[in-house]
């Protein structure tokens, strides 16, 4: 699956990448600290799977996921968050899965 990773924290983004790097089903095609850059990329490329942080300044992960779903309704959305309070919002927007930071590779 063509995968994008989005987190405003560079270290967390690198951890996302490390945990997905050798998984045969994932081809990381984009890594973004700016949600708008992720939307711009997804508008011009095939993206099957998005691993998103929720709590980001400016555009949060919920709004990013909604924008990605407008571009491609069947994109798989997985949220990674350290804040359980965001789980309800993620479920309301019909996220495919929510994982809590810190997470293990098996959680993806």
Which role fits each region the language model picked out?
Residues 1-2:
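Non-catalytic signal-transmission and effector/linker regions of two-component phosphorelay proteins
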Residues 9-30, 70:
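Two-component/phosphorelay signaling modules centered on CheY-like receiver
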Residues 35-108:
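CheY-like receiver
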Residues 8-9, 54:
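Generic detector of well-ordered alpha-helical packing
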């Amino acid at each position: 699956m063509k995968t994008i990773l989005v987190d405003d924290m560079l270290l967390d983004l690198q951890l996302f990448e490390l945990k997905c790097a050798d998984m045969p089903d994932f081809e990381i095609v984009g890594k973004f600290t700016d949600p708008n850059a992720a939307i711009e990329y997804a508008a011009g490329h095939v993206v099957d799977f998005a691993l998103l942080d929720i709590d980001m300044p400016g555009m949060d992960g919920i709004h990013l996921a909604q924008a990605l779903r407008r571009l491609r309704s069947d994109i798989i959305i997985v949220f990674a968050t350290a804040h359980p309070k965001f789980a309800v919002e993620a479920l309301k927007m019909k996220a495919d899965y929510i994982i809590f930071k810190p997470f293990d590779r098996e959680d993806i």
